[in-house]
Amino acid sequence: MQKKLVVLYFLVLLAFAGLSARLVLINRDNGEQYKRQVLSQQQYSSRTLPFKRGEILDSKGTKLAVSEKVYNLVLDCKLMNEKEEYVEGTIAALTQCFDVSESDIRSYNEQNPTSQYHVLQRQLTYDEIAPFQELQNNEEQGKYIQGVWFEEEYRRVYPNNTMAADVVGFTSKDNVGNYGLEEYYNDILSGINGREYGYMNDDSNLERTTKAAVDGYNLVTTLDANIQGIVERKLQEYNDTYKNAAREGNGAQNVGCIIMDVNNGDILAMASYPFFNLN
């Protein structure tokens, strides 16, 4: 009996050895092929994390230029088309909450059924997207709303509209300074985008890696918003008073004014007329 157990033990051991050898050979000869098959069954998740451009402030902290978070409304047709009820539920929710055309969405979906990125609206505020998010989170309606997500970005806003417009300058749509301080100090005000990425399998197991965005630095000027406001108001009053007096048009074609602190050379106000709205 003992001899039979010993023989059985060695047979099992040989079987495991043979199986191990077979696995080694499979990995050597077909490892890359199986690796590609596994990766093909996974979903790659990647998104950009936008940096926040630095603020421009006067000497007392009054904000002359800021960046506010906004959201792009993005449609993933491939995900929405997984079930017919998803298509109807999603389109109904979109047309209920946003100024989008049902016919345009259906037309795009028919022509691009596998599209995973289509921007329906840009630069929406949080208040504008909140009603839709409520529908998404609703236990009954939410399960039929699929393939819609919000892409975050920042929009440049100038709280005082025309104040120090020639000095502050403005940015282009891609968040790059194009004029004034925005352009001159663009490298300081700009940051570096981050990224979040990872692989997701069918069980929604995701090994996620996040590289955080680096925000831009704030820029503090020597301007005094109170003095700046007084200067601009006086320039406006002058031009309103003498408009169409000596000739047709403004009191002056162009007017400029600079207020300097004689003790240290700080520029407290710098204005020119006509004004323009930075927003």
Where do the protein language model's features map onto the residues?
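Periplasmic/cell-envelope proteins involved in peptidoglycan metabolism and beta-lactam response
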Residues: 1-279
